[in-house]
């Protein structure tokens, strides 16, 4: 007879984790979920095991709004090893080609310029995108290459930091769906020498403050401190969380009076003054502006519910 599944606590918010190198995004997600004893958790766009940096982890009801972070732009610092191409486009892969590094400063500047702005990118075979129901990296591990369509991305900023020997350091501000490994691999081919990522750090996601990032070690230390002091771990851990609606912070706010919000929370569109003409909105209620979900302005100018916060009993 199987034991009943243990239910975690109803904690809602977003933790800005500084992901360590060498761990998968799912591994750190599970560790954070256990530390917080959360009933639900999800991340908002995986980082490769080699990569470090900002990984927003949504807990509880915040998982409903994680999609808005998946759609947001991001900034990275990357160091490439020139002269070597790998099968994964990073240092975790096998070297498949070595060539001399002979380009000039002018050739580098010209090559970098081709990656700025709106461009098309063919994703790496070593990615989590799916083809006929299977992830691309599953095919790649079997030595199978499948067709991939080029996808539109935007590189808002591509900053040259340094070029020393066979290392090239860049900073990239880009749209959703951008693979930094692929940019480096494509750049290496354009320069005629090959390249792969040896260091990758995600600096920012959307408008989240960098100073609110915390490490796994810090979380574990706080949990241990709470146990030593005989206080609930939540007392030390929960203040680290960003609000559950922070993934949707770019959307305008519509505040409903309590007389209208009850209908909205029951799934009905409502009319209210001050709403935009169209698009998605963050919906709050009452004088304290409590977040109750995401809405969308319908054809009649009403605020129609799209994703609602489920209120759990205390």
Swiss-Prot record:
Responsible for synthesis of pseudouridine from uracil-55 in the psi GC loop of transfer RNAs. NCBIfam families: TruB (TIGR00431). InterPro entries: PsdUridine_synth_cat_dom_sf, PsdUridine_synth_N, PUA-like_sf, PUA_sf, tRNA_psdUridine_synth_TruB, tRNA_sdUridine_synth_fam1_C, TruB_C. Its EC number is 5.4.99.25. It comes from the Bacteria. Keywords: Isomerase, tRNA processing. The active site is at residue 48. The lineage of its organism: Bacteria, Pseudomonadati, Pseudomonadota, Gammaproteobacteria, Enterobacterales. This is tRNA pseudouridine synthase B. It comes from Salmonella arizonae (strain ATCC BAA-731 / CDC346-86 / RSK2980). It holds the Pfam family TruB_N. It is an enzyme of class 5 (isomerase). Belongs to the pseudouridine synthase TruB family. Type 1 subfamily. GO terms for molecular function: RNA binding; tRNA pseudouridine(55) synthase activity. GO terms for biological process: mRNA pseudouridine synthesis; tRNA pseudouridine synthesis. Substrate binds at residues 43, 76, 179, 200. The gene is truB. It catalyses: uridine(55) in tRNA = pseudouridine(55) in tRNA. Disulfide bonds: none annotated.
